[in-house]
Amino acid sequence: KYDVIFADPPYDMEPERLERLIGMVFERNLLSEEGLLIVEHSSKVYLEEVPHFQEERRYGGTTFSLFNNE
């Protein structure tokens, strides 16, 4: 299991595919108990409703969405 997973998929990836990618990390139990998944994506995409969402940090056109096991 991993403490940190950083995903940097293509910026033009559809939100549905991003949600599937996030879901796979949790379905396959890849994170340690206190682990963190960080997904870099366009600020035009909002992932707050995706399960395991913790917070986001926006930097201009780039957003980092953070997910954990809680």
Model regions and ranges:
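Class I S-adenosyl-L-methionine-dependent methyltransferase catalytic core
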Residues: 1-70
